[in-house]
């Protein structure tokens, strides 16, 4: 039996940020279809020259992507959501830490998220809930 649930979409996202999110949504979805090594290669190129994103910048980008896409706002949209948020940050001249990994407690499921200042952005779980398998950090920084 399934339980219906409503998705929460951020409502207070400015129009300009929503426009930027719509702009990066198609590239994010296309990127999400690539194998992990290609995603990493593309993101490594895109992150060059960007400053590390603050938690506020990363959250604003994530909120904007969730506001314009029900798929990204949903429970199975983590990969395009995290890619879209990273690309939107890049449009603003910053780069969050983009991560993929798995939950550390059963059932072990794959997940993708963004981090800033060493903390997952708006995931609603403790910092150690996921373990990183791959990360694309801002240039000059190394993963934990």
Regions found by a protein language model. Give the residues of each.
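Helix-boundary/low-complexity linker signature
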Residues: 1-144
């Amino acid at each position: 039996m399934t339980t219906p649930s409503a998705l929460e979409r951020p409502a207070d996202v400015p129009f300009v940020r929503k426009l930027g999110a719509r702009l990066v949504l198609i590239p994010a979805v296309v990127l999400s279809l690539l194998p992990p090594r290609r995603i990493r290669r593309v993101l490594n190129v895109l992150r060059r020259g960007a400053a590390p994103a603050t938690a506020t910048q990363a959250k604003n980008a994530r909120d904007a992507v969730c506001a314009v896409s029900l798929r990204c706002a949903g429970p199975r949209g983590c990969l395009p959501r995290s890619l879209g948020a990273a690309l939107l940050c890049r449009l603003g001249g910053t780069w969050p830490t983009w991560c993929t990994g798995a939950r550390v407690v059963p059932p072990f499921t794959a997940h993708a998220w963004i981090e800033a200042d060493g903390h997952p952005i708006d995931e609603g779980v403790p910092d150690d809930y996921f373990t990183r398998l791959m990360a694309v950090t801002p240039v000059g920084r190394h993963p934990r």
